[in-house]
Amino acid sequence: TLTTKLHGGYVKSLEDRDRIFNEQLNKTGAEYFDYYLLHAIGRDMYENKYLKFDCFNWLREKKRLGLVKHIGFSFHDSAAVLDRILTEQPDMEFVQLQLNFLDWESEGVQSRLCYEVACKHGVPVIVMEPVKGGSLVNLPSEADAILRSLGDGSNASYAIRFAASFDNVCMVLSGMGSMEMVRDNISYMKDFKPLTPEEMGGVKRVADVFRSQNLISCTACNYCTERCPKNIPIPAYFAC
């Protein structure tokens, strides 16, 4: 499966859309992409980039031509904004959401609310940030003890299985930096079993520990460092 995206930050004219797309085809040597998404949509990006430059209709045309098999977008905003977009763009085939057990009830990320909006519109969800940039793997001792009491699964396994336990989730993206991580992911996803009620209760208790300790909710996506005028490695300081 081959997937890539159109980043609105690089689109400054109608011509940029095809230029970027053709460069992506040339660099990959592919004839088409299985999944193609409009990247990091929120209200501002939706209105000032993707609508302004007619990117949804452009993407539909790529699908009509057979250059893209499935079209959708990744999303970072409120459930209300997502509802508006899916109402205005009803033929989107997937939406990529930040979904993990820490952000599930977050007032800022609104994972649960956004998931419910996708369900309402019948749009499958692809999950990003299931381990929240590693935050749900490298746990505080109190939280780690909770997961250890559930069994011998890795911390990542509980986080990724949480994300994959919802009926409308069609795919979970997992950033893997070693063969050990690949093997670990395969071990519990090959013959997947959703979290049991006991395990679901355990990960919710882990989320409570995070909230009680006022830990900084950072995914280490580094978007902030790209915009920092002093080039401060902000996620690295948060991780200290």
Task: Give, region by region, the residue ranges found by the protein language model.
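Structured C-terminal cap/extension of enzyme domains
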Residues: 91, 113-240
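N-terminal glycine-rich cofactor-binding segment that shapes the pocket for flavin-like pterin cofactors
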Residues: 1-4
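Glycine/proline-rich, positively charged
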Residues: 8-131, 138-144, 150-151, 163-165
